[in-house]
Structures are given as C-alpha cells and as structure tokens.
Amino acid sequence: MKKVLATIGFFCVTPLALAQNAPPVQEITKQIIKSAQGYANAISCPGVVITPKEIAALTPYKTLDDRMDAKYAVLWDGDIGCAGGSGTSGTNISIVTVSIGDSFVVDPHTSSPIIQFESPVRSVSRIVGNTRDTLILEGKEFADNDPNCCPSITVRFTLRVDDKGNWKLVEKKLLPAKK
C-alpha cells in the first residue's frame, strides 16, 4: 500500500516539477540582446548596439512549458547590407524566439530585411507599448526644411503585423512640440 501511495504521490508532483518557471527576466533580456545583436551585425554595418528598451515582449516566456511560444520584437538601427551614404540607415526589426535548450534565436523569415517594417520615421526613438500583434512607437519625421540629420516633428504610430509577417502602418498622429 505504501508503494502505491508513493507512486501516486510521485505522479501528482511530477507535473508541477515540469512546469518550472522561465529564467529571470534579466537573463532572458541578455539572451535576446545577444541573439538580435549578432544577427544585426551580421547583416548590416558592424557596431549595432541593442539595449533592453528596444525589446517588446509580443508573447513573453513565463514557464518552460510556454517557451516555444515566446516571441520578442527587437528594434535596432542599422544599414542593412552596409550600403553607406546618408539616408541608408534606419530602424529595423528582428523577431527573437526561444528554441530547444533555451536557445534564443532570430527568425530571419519574420525579421528585416525579409519582411516589411513600415515605419514612417527613419529612426524609432522609443517603444510606447505593444500587444501580440501591434507595436506603438514614437519617432521624428522631417519637416520641409529639416536637414537630413535632424527630423523635428514627433509622431506616434502603430504598426500591426499581417498574416505574412509584415509590420504595416495602421495609425499615425502628430504629437505636440515640446517647449
């Protein structure tokens, strides 16, 4: 009887042990940056630096059971193909997923340059918010007489991912000038 109870207890506790928590957020962030930065520097001019504020958790990694569903959008500025010249650098997107063995990898089929990232600005200044399929971003557009280096009109815009993985502009609004 004791063996039967011990066996039942084992099978009751085992699923709880398997539904372990994900690594700490700091470790997840570190691995996302490492993966996205390696990808960005491989396809663009070297020197791309990614920080935690450029990551949006589309589907966060919370437990070992949901890690294969985890998805992160990472924005980075770079010149894909290292074409050079003014105006060739801009904001790009990499989609980082979690693979077997807790490997964080960029999915090139859902990342720049394969997909379209319809940002109305050359450089995104911040991620305002996100859902599983939208990004709300801010950046600056060029006024008529702005030099190529320095856009001056602040805009907030929303991109939504379509069924092909392209990030399409669905809304844009001007923000009041800061005084």
What are these regions (language model features)?
Residues Q20-K179:
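Exposed acidic/polar residues on beta-strands and adjacent loops within beta-sheet cores, strongest
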Residues V4-T14:
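Sec-dependent N-terminal signal peptides
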Residues P15-A19:
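Sec/Tat signal peptide C-region and signal peptidase I cleavage site
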